[in-house]
A protein has these predicted regions:
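Conserved ABC ATPase "signature" region
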Residues: 124-139
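Hydrophobic anchor residue at the start of the ABC signature
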Residues: 157
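Conserved ABC ATPase signature
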Residues: 143-153
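Catalytic Walker B motif of ABC-type/P-loop ATPase nucleotide-binding domains
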Residues: 168-171
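ABC ATPase NBD coupling module
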Residues: 69-94
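Helix N-cap at the start of a conserved alpha-helix in ABC-type nucleotide-binding domains
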Residues: 179-181
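A short, proline-enriched helix->beta-strand linker immediately N-terminal to the Walker B motif
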Residues: 162-166
Length: 216
C-alpha cells in the first residue's frame, strides 16, 4: 500500500535542525507494527509523512497503491496536487491522535460517523457496531466533554476505522491513559484493525505495551 525508498524530511532551524531518513519502508495489508522511541525521536514526523499531511524533501521514492493503481506521492507533492493527496488521505488513511482530536460540538455518534459522512458513505450499522466492539455503545449521545480520557480514545479509534481505511496510524494513543486503560485501549485498537485486515502502525514510547498487544 505504501512504499518508501530513501525518503528524507528536514525540519527546524539552526541547532534545532534535524533530518529524518527512511531508507526503506513497506506497509502492507494486515501488518501490525509498532514505531518505538522516546519523545523527539521523529515518530510523529514519520507518521505525518505516511499520513500524507507532510511533504518529503525532494528525492527518493514514495508510492501509494490505492484503487488498483499506484500513485507517485512524492510527485503529487512536487506538483502541488493537494486535491489528489486530500482524496487519498480521506479514503485510505485512518488517524488516531494522542489526544483524540474529537469535535466538541458533535456527540459521539456523529464524531464516529464523521469520516463516513465526509466521503458520502451511507449511514448504516457501522457506527453502532464499532461502538459495541469498543465498549462505548452507551455513550453515543454524549458530547466528548462528558467522557473519560479512555472513552474519548475509543471514540477516536472508532472514527479512524469507520470509513474502512486501508491503513490506520496512531500517534501515542495511550500516552495520556493510566496503565489499565492503556492496556485495554491498545488491545481494542489492535483487535479491531486485525479483524478488518487493516495495516496498523502505532507510534509509542512503551515497547512492552506494544509487544503485549501483538505489535511487531
Amino acid at each position: 500500500m505504501l512504499k518508501l525508498r530513501d525518503i528524507r524530511k528536514t525540519r527546524g532551524e539552526g541547532p534545532q535542525r534535524y533530518s529524518l531518513v527512511v531508507p526503506r519502508l513497506d506497509l502492507r495489508p494486515g501488518q501490525r507494527l509498532a514505531l518505538v522511541g522516546p519523545s523527539g525521536s521523529g515518530k510523529s514526523t514519520l507518521l505525518d509523512l505516511l499520513a500524507l499531511v507532510l511533504s518529503p524533501d525532494p528525492g527518493g521514492v514514495f508510492e501509494c497503491r490505492a484503487d488498483d493503481r499506484t500513485l507517485d506521492v512524492a510527485g503529487l507533492w512536487r506538483s502541488g496536487r493537494q486535491d489528489v493527496l486530500a482524496g487519498l488521505r480521506s479514503r485510505v488513511m485512518g488517524y488516531v491522535l494522542q489526544t483524540g482530536g474529537l469535535l466538541g460540538f458533535l456527540d459521539v455518534q456523529r464524531n464516529i460517523g464523521l469520516s463516513r459522512a465526509l466521503l458520502g458513505l451511507p449511514a448504516d450499522a457501522t457506527v453502532g457496531r464499532l461502538a459495541e466492539q469498543l465498549e462505548i455503545a452507551d455513550q453515543l449521545h454524549k458530547l466528548p466533554a462528558a467522557l473519560s480520557v479512555g472513552q474519548r480514545q475509543r471514540v477516536s479509534i472508532a472514527r479512524a476505522l469507520a470509513h474502512g481505511p486501508s491503513i490506520v496510524l496512531a500517534d501515542e494513543p495511550t500516552a495520556s491513559l493510566d496503565p489499565l486503560n492503556a492496556e485495554r485501549v491498545m488491545q481494542l485498537l489492535v483487535a479491531q484493525a486485525e479483524e478488518r485486515g487493516v495495516c496498523i502502525l502505532v507510534a509509542t514510547h512503551d515497547e512492552a505495551l506494544a509487544r503485549r498487544a501483538g505489535l511487531q
